[in-house]
């Protein structure tokens, strides 16, 4: 693939789209053959009418298509730009030769994914991926395939897209016409956004005005400052000497066209040379609208989406009488997209159309002929799910009409009588071909539309109105989709160019015929010049009925393809909210009682809209935190510790919820916490991550998830100065594992809850009633949730003895079915590593634990749903198992092992008399199952405090004990006490290590089982995929055989007709010979008749003579002595003789 180059003279004031990698070679498509279309006969035309084709054939075989001669040159469309490789039906971007595999989107660099207009590369359905080192362009087979690829790439770059606030920039623009340009020239425009070329118009010749009428729509744009339209003369190749082809430009600031309303006006063109004429110079009419759509996290739209999904019928019926047609269009568009993505589109359209049927009553001819929400909704749904069907059914036919000069004008007032017969023949041929394309497209008719039409038919049958179901289907499909697409292909993305006058007239006449065919109506007195098509209409009514029956047949729904495009649900919800908020605000301001009653009928919708509007205008601290934190998680891999990001959050006074300790009995606790407490935030993802040594330096966040910030309890702002103290030791995230090391000298362990929460989550304050005066309010983690304020009761002896048996990792169940944890390679945390770390941590525990105490311990256990349960360890003192080395500085990060969480010292909390349990604000949270036995706890505390009862201590001894409680023992005393404690519990630790090893083996076996199950599932999915592929191949083979059978049938019919014609010719020749023989006999008889006539004439004359002679003799009295004898000669003559 090469960089599309534009001649220098065409781009004096803008830069072109960035080039692509030079590693790819251009594969230009063959140029169109410009030979005219020829048709040997009617049946040949019908053979070309089948919709079925494969991508391995060119889209338009101009040597065999129907007769539309004099093709136009396509140079004005491609402008010599290299085209992308032509895709085949069996190829995919996933093939090994695809360039998608060459992209590395996980390096943290900014990546931009945007669609490319077809006028840039001369190829449809392309998109461009731009990154720091260059850019690449890719071509897809359809718009839906392109949209899905773009969305998948964007989610790879920004996995947290749905869970963060974002802005979507959308531009819709029409370049309509220009005036006052030089005549007899061809002109085109280039559309640039911030000096980057995004699209071109086609070339148009100047007449009175230059009319382009082309529409451009761009989504997911970067922030824009200006829209620039450059105008050029289209110089012919033979006249390249004229390099002055630049006309001028129009610059439109985006601020002037920003809003919900379109701005349409004439803009003066700025030319390189000032205009010296009297006129004001050239100008261009442009209609545009630029919108920045602010989209909140999907969580914010939950209630709104539920309301729309459940109450769409009420919403439409209430708003129908009070909103404009433009608002109806936008409302219908948003509702259709939202309900299609939520699976309710069929119910929505069925309910709306049936309400239309009830409203119209006996006047069912008005259905889909009014500007109602139902009409606009079915229009939008047809465009949404039927776009690819429209291209398959009519794309080639429309392109052929554009490229032909065939004249189909049949109005006698607009053409001569000598041309009328030919024009009528042309129109009839085009209508036959168009209808043949449509009725043969049933095999690719969208499944969703079949389901909707079948639902309409069933509802009409239930209501006893089955006679109008056919009218509903034909009116929606033809009146609102196919016929408008034939009349205006550019509005339905079939063609970019607006048709010229002759092509537009041809398309209009074809649409008239097809619409009358769908209505089962003939042409009447209004359009008498179209009456010659009535025979065609009557002949094709049967085919139309069969087509309507086929596309509404529920038995064939599973055999047809479905909608596979992408819908940005967040954007559609934001658009719908903006529209409804504007409408409801206007209604609420009205003084009319009807308008106020309308608002009241909407129920909770105004409040829901107001809440979303408040979130849009005033982002909450939670959203601000999430936005700040998302900056660290914009890519799947995050390097280094996240403690700096968290420290920034806690440096904000409004975000810190830590109380300063007030109670004198807890001053020692306050002091010790400031110096020694370590915090760790657990990742919110439900996926388990593999631990390795690399994880000590780098935390990897799973793709598609957001890290949940810690929940903070609600406190007073005046007590936030300890927030930074708590962060002396930074935080390390590793997967979803948890390790907490905290050293404290307080007396009891606070009750702990575990709250599983779904990602994403942010910090949120707890109920104010949970704040206890003088208590410490530390961070509470998502999984498990630690609260160090409320007292925890003691544990029975039976629970104490078996407490460590219940230890487990805090890892969540991942997508790989890992219940406990996952080990990887050479960095697995084995028990030897664990023992080594335990030995290394002995010196640390000697320095940082309070001697002469047996400290209870609480560790979380993660169940299958991500909830942690607390188990109490009696006589804990696990200093020997601490992981941090003795030289651990305040800036050191904690490390989470791959198998378990280790605590260096136990936690004890001062009991609070009225201390209520803090609860996470989650319905799934549950309390730790620890029984309340305070007496045992007090007894244990008294036993570990001192061999001497505190009541017998002197003031000096009590002071010394207080100092010791603050961790200020001498080094040798600490070591002595620690050694005694270690010796006492060494055997117990060995037992626990054995138990943990056994649990490790069990977990490993579970992991293997889960991997085996996953493999079986993958094999089943692969088998299912192969089965579907086989079914698809069978379907294609069946369709191919059907097509071959149709072709063979047509060929046999043609051969039979030719044979009949030959037989007729033979019969005709034989009859001609018989006729010739008969003619000869007739001629001979005629000659004999003529001779007999002449003989008869002579006979009569002889008789007359004899009669006269005889009469004379009688009168004279002379008797004839010798009578005259009459004799006949041999040749037939008479002779007189006398005796």
UniProtKB/Swiss-Prot annotation:
Tell me which residues make up the PH domain.
41-158
A Gene Ontology biological process term: signal transduction
- The Basic and acidic residues compositionally biased stretches are 73-87, 833-855
What Gene3D superfamilies does the entry give?
Answer: C2 domain, GTPase Activation - p120gap, domain 1
Task: Identify the stretch(es) annotated as Disordered.
Answer: 1-87, 684-704, 751-782, 803-869, 910-953, 1116-1139
Say if the entry is tagged with keyword Translocase: no
Keywords (alphabetical) are: GTPase activation, Phosphoprotein
CDD domains according to UniProt: C2_SynGAP_like, RasGAP_DAB2IP
Bias category Basic residues: which stretches? 45-56
Where are residues bearing Phosphoserine located in the sequence?
Answer: 16, 89, 663, 864
Q: Name one GO molecular function term.
A: GTPase activator activity
Biased region (Low complexity) positions are 916-928
Top-level division of the source organism's lineage: Eukaryota
As stated in the Swiss-Prot or TrEMBL entry, residues carrying the post-translational modification Phosphothreonine are: 620
Q: Name one GO cellular component term.
A: cytosol
Q: Where is this site: Arginine finger?
A: 369
- Summarize the subunit comment: Interacts with PEAK1.
Described by its record, this protein's role is as follows: Inhibitory regulator of the Ras-cyclic AMP pathway.
Name of the molecule in the record: Ras GTPase-activating protein nGAP
Taxonomic lineage per UniProt?
Answer: Eukaryota, Metazoa, Chordata, Craniata, Vertebrata
């Amino acid at each position: 693939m090469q960089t599309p180059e534009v001649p220098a003279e065409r781009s004096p004031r803008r830069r072109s789209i960035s080039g692509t990698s030079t590693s790819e070679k251009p594969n230009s498509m063959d140029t169109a053959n410009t030979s005219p279309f020829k048709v040997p006969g009617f049946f040949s035309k019908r053979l070309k009418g089948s919709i079925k084709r494969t991508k391995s054939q060119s889209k338009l075989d101009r040597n065999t298509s129907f007769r539309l001669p004099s093709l136009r040159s396509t140079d004005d469309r491609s402008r010599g730009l290299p085209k992308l490789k032509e895709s085949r039906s069996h190829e995919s971007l996933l093939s090994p030769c695809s360039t998608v595999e060459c992209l590395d989107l996980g390096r943290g660099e900014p990546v931009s994914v945007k669609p490319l207009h077809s006028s840039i590369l001369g190829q449809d359905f392309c998109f461009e991926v731009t990154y720091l080192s260059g850019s690449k362009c890719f071509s897809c087979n359809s718009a839906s395939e392109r949209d899905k690829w773009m969305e998948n790439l964007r989610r790879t770059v920004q996995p947290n897209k749905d869970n963060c606030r974002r802005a979507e920039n959308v531009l819709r623009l029409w370049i309509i016409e220009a005036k006052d340009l030089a005549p007899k020239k061809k002109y085109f425009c280039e559309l640039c956004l911030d000096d980057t070329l995004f699209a071109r118009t086609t070339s148009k010749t100047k007449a009175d005005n230059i009319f382009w009428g082309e529409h451009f729509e761009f989504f997911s744009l970067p922030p824009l400052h200006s829209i620039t339209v450059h105008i050029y003369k289209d110089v012919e190749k033979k006249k390249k000497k004229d390099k002055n082809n630049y006309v001028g430009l129009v610059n439109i600031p985006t601020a002037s066209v920003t809003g919900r309303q379109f701005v349409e006006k004439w803009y003066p063109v700025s030319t390189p040379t000032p205009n010296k004429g009297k006129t004001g110079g050239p100008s261009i009419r442009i209609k545009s609208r630029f919108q920045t759509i602010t989209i909140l996290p999907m969580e914010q739209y939950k209630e709104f989406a539920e309301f729309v999904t459940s109450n769409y019928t009420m919403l439409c019926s209430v708003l129908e009488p009070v909103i404009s047609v433009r608002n109806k269009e936008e409302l219908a568009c948003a509702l259709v997209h939202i309900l299609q993505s939520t699976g309710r589109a069929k119910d929505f359209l069925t309910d709306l159309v049936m309400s239309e049927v009830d409203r119209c009553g006996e006047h069912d001819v008005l259905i889909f002929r009014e500007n109602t929400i139902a009409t606009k909704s079915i229009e939008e749904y047809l465009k949404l799910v039927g776009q690819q069907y429209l291209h398959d059914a009519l794309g080639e036919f429309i392109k052929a009409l554009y490229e032909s000069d065939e004249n189909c004008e049949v109005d006698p007032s607009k053409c001569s009588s000598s041309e009328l017969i030919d024009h009528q023949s042309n129109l009839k041929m085009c209508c036959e071909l168009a209808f043949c394309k449509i009725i043969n497209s049933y095999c690719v008719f969208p499944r969703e539309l079949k389901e909707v039409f079948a639902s309409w038919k069933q509802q009409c049958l239930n209501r006893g109105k089955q006679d109008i179901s056919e009218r509903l289907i034909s009116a929606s499909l033809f009146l609102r989709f196919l016929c408008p697409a034939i009349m205006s292909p550019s509005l339905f993305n079939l063609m970019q160019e607006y048709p010229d006058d002759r092509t537009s007239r041809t398309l209009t006449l074809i649409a008239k015929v097809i619409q009358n065919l769908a209505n089962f109506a003939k042409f009447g007195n209004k359009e008498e010049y179209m009456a010659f098509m009535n025979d065609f209409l009557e002949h094709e009514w049967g085919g139309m009925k069969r087509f309507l029956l086929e596309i509404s047949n529920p038995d064939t729904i599973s055999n047809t393809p479905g909608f596979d495009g992408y819908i940005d649900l967040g954007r559609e919800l934001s658009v719908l909210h903006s529209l409804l908020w504007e409408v409801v605000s206007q209604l609420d301001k009205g003084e009319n009682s009807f308008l106020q009653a309308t608002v009241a009928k909407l129920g909770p919708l105004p409040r829901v809209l107001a809440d979303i509007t408040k979130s849009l205008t005033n982002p909450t601290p939670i959203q601000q935190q999430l936005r700040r934190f998302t900056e660290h998680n914009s890519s799947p891999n995050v390097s280094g510790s996240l403690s700096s990001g968290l420290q920034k959050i806690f440096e904000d006074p409004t975000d810190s919820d830590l109380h300063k300790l007030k109670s004198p009995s807890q001053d020692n606790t306050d002091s010790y916490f400031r110096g020694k407490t370590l915090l760790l935030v657990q990742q919110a993802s439900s996926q388990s991550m593999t631990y390795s040594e690399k994880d000590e330096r780098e935390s990897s966040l799973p793709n598609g998830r957001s890290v949940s910030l810690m929940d903070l309890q609600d406190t007073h702002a005046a007590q936030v100065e300890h927030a930074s103290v708590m962060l002396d030791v930074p935080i390390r995230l590793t997967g979803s594992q948890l390790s907490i090391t905290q050293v404290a000298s307080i007396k009891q362990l606070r009750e702990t809850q575990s709250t599983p929460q779904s990602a994403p989550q942010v910090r949120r304050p707890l109920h104010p009633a949970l704040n206890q005066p003088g208590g410490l309010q530390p961070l509470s983690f998502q999984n498990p949730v630690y609260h160090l304020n409320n007292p925890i009761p003691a544990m029975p002896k039976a629970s104490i003895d078996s407490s460590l048996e219940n230890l487990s990792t805090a890892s969540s169940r991942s997508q790989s079915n890992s219940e406990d944890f996952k080990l990887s390679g050479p960095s697995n945390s084995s028990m030897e590593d664990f023992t080594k770390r335990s030995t290394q941590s002995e010196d640390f525990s000697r320095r940082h634990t309070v001697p002469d105490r047996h400290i209870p311990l609480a560790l979380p256990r993660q169940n299958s749903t991500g909830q942690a349960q607390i188990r109490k360890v009696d006589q804990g003192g696990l200093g020997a198992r601490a992981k941090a080395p003795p030289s651990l500085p305040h800036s050191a990060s904690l490390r989470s092992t791959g198998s378990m969480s280790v605590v260096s010292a136990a936690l004890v909390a001062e009991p609070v008399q009225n201390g209520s349990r803090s609860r996470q604000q989650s319905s799934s949270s549950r309390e730790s199952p620890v029984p309340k036995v305070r007496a045992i706890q007090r007894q244990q505390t008294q036993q570990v405090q001192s061999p001497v009862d505190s009541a017998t201590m002197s003031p000096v001894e009590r002071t010394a004990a207080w100092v010791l409680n603050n961790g200020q023992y001498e080094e040798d005393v600490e070591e002595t006490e620690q050694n005694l404690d270690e010796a006492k519990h060494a055997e117990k630790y060995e037992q626990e290590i054995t138990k943990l090893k056994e649990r490790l083996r069990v977990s490993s076996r579970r992991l293997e089982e889960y991997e085996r199950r996953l493999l079986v599932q993958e094999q089943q999915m692969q088998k299912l995929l192969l089965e579907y592929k086989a079914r698809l191949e069978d379907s294609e083979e069946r369709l191919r055989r059907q097509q071959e059978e149709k072709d063979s049938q047509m060929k046999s019919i043609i051969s039979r007709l030719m044979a009949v014609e030959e037989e007729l010719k033979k019969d005709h020749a034989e009859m001609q010979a018989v006729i010739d023989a008969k003619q000869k006999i007739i001629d001979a008889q005629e000659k004999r008749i003529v001779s007999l006539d002449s003989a008869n004439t002579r006979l009569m004359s002889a008789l007359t003579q004899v009669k006269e002679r005889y009469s004379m003799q009688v009168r004279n009295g002379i008797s004839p002595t010798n009578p005259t004898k009459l004799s006949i000669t041999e040749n037939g003559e008479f002779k007189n003789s006398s005796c």
